Amino acid sequence: MQNRLIEIFNETDFDQFDIELMESITSQLTDRPVELMIVDDERMRTLNKTYRDIDKTTDVLSFPMQEIPNAPLGSIVINADKVLHTAKELGHSAKDEFALLYIHGLLHLLGYDHESDNGEMRAMEEKLIIEYNLPKSLIIRTYE
């Protein structure tokens, strides 16, 4: 059996994601495992309030871990309700939307920060969405 880089904790019945795609993206960028939580709007709002003091839901959160040998890179939390809503609104699949949010969260775990860098995160997102034939990235949509 192949070792997985991603450990999934799904608190919902959402299943519209491609684990092989996410494993491929992850292994391209890191050899450290990643924890992935899939939650609903209510749980995401609670996490956002607790850890960022922002009392509203969001689509993706990242929680990096310290550089401890054999420890995961960190945790990515994706809001399944937002995935479904945004995919429908933008006219692409929930699997594609999930992959975009996963990439966004993974890049944050790797130290990229679109709020303070000089476009490096946006460039890396664009590279990955082209390579994996995904729709426009979260950052690109934000700036349009």
UniProtKB/Swiss-Prot annotation:
Alphabetized UniProt keyword annotations: Cytoplasm, Endonuclease, Hydrolase, Metal-binding, Nuclease, Ribosome biogenesis, rRNA processing, Zinc
Principal location: cytoplasm
Keyword Nuclease set for record: yes
Tagged with keyword Acetylation: no
Note on cofactor: Binds 1 zinc ion.
Signal sequence segment: none
InterPro entries, alphabetized: MetalPrtase_cat_dom_sf_prd (IPR023091), YbeY (IPR002036), YbeY_CS (IPR020549)
Cofactor(s) this protein cannot do without: Zn(2+)
Binding site for Zn(2+): H104, H108, H114
GO cellular component, one term: cytoplasm
Subcellular location: Cytoplasm
NCBIfam families: rRNA maturation RNase YbeY
Name used for this protein in its record: Endoribonuclease YbeY
Naturally occurring in which organism (per UniProt): Nitratiruptor sp. (strain SB155-2)
